[in-house]
């Protein structure tokens, strides 16, 4: 089974908030053996639909979506 973790942020027009979120995603990537993809609900890309499509295209048989609403923005 191939598992992919999608970390779902709210999204922001503030580049600093998006950068903080992406730092978290990079940290998770370095700590896990399975792929980790970012996604946003709005105001930033990629959206959740695009992240799911990417996961499926890479052969994922399990997709876990973890909401992460920690950053101001």
Language model region names:
Residues 1-73:
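Active-site-proximal alpha-helix that buttresses catalytic centers in soluble enzyme cores
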